[in-house]
């Protein structure tokens, strides 16, 4: 009887420890897929983006990368404004550049050097 209890305890411990691992690795149990209400991944094509773009309401300019509604294209915000700096270019466009841990103004200086062909 003690052996039976010990074996059952070990099996339940192993299931608790590795059960999720095996379910994730093999994705099936008993030949049937299990769905526990987990969210589905976005599709691998552009249909999700097109749906968001098509359903956006904007009477001015709709920024293609952030779907923000602004007056002019160069007013579009950067998608990751905490990590990127926005630079407005002379042609009425804008560019988002990673801050990269540089000193204040260093990114702008490097962008200007690149624009002049010196970098």
From Swiss-Prot:
InterPro entries for this protein: LCL2
Entry annotated with the keyword Signal: yes
Keywords: Signal
Signal peptide: 1-16
GO biological process: ERAD pathway
Annotated region described as Disordered, given as residue ranges: 29-48
Entry annotated with the keyword Signal: yes
Functional note: Probable component of the endoplasmic reticulum-associated degradation (ERAD) pathway.
Membership in a protein family: Belongs to the LCL2 family.
Name of the featured protein: Long chronological lifespan protein 2
